[in-house]
Amino acid sequence: MSDTKRWDGPPVETWSMAWTPDQAAEALEGVAAPWAVAGGWALDLWLGKQTRKHEDLEITVPRAFFPEIQARLEGLGLQLFAVDDGQAIALEPGEAPGRRGFQTWAMEPAVNGWRMDVFSEPGDAQTWIYRRTGELSAPRAWASGRTPAGIPYVAPQIVLLFKAKATRDKDQVDFALIAPKLLPEARDWLAAALRIIQPGHLWIDQLSA
């Protein structure tokens, strides 16, 4: 059996062409799906300023609403790829990613570069559900926010919850910057969530201090 991985898209290095949140919001203007910017960009949107360079642009959307995002991006001429287990498999227009994982990368053929990483999540328009285990949930209105310009983003306590898994250098920097600024309710929630999914995580004591 061959161990060759299938990679239909451009090199990963072309994520240097990723859209900014402003560009993503312009592309998705009028789409009713409850999407939101995720990852490090979401923290910067919450802060109201860019604090560091970002390697890509991630958005999240409940799985049931993914076809709306797909239709808009394909309508703009982008090609979508199901990405999982080191593979990037090109999707036909309107083709669902199926069981190929939760990540779909959007590439613009005109520049042969990646523009956006779309996470298909559980939950619905009213409820956010933690994708990795399903053990945690919260009202979507509490788990997200909007900039003054109307760009939706994942709330910082949710972003940090996902960043806690690997705790790369940039994740630790983000935590040190964001955690002291969280409201008490958000800090307490994040600490409690970590006790459930990652007991003993070094951030728990820092959040409780």
What residues fall within each predicted segment?
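Compositionally biased terminal segments of proteins
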Residues: M1-A209
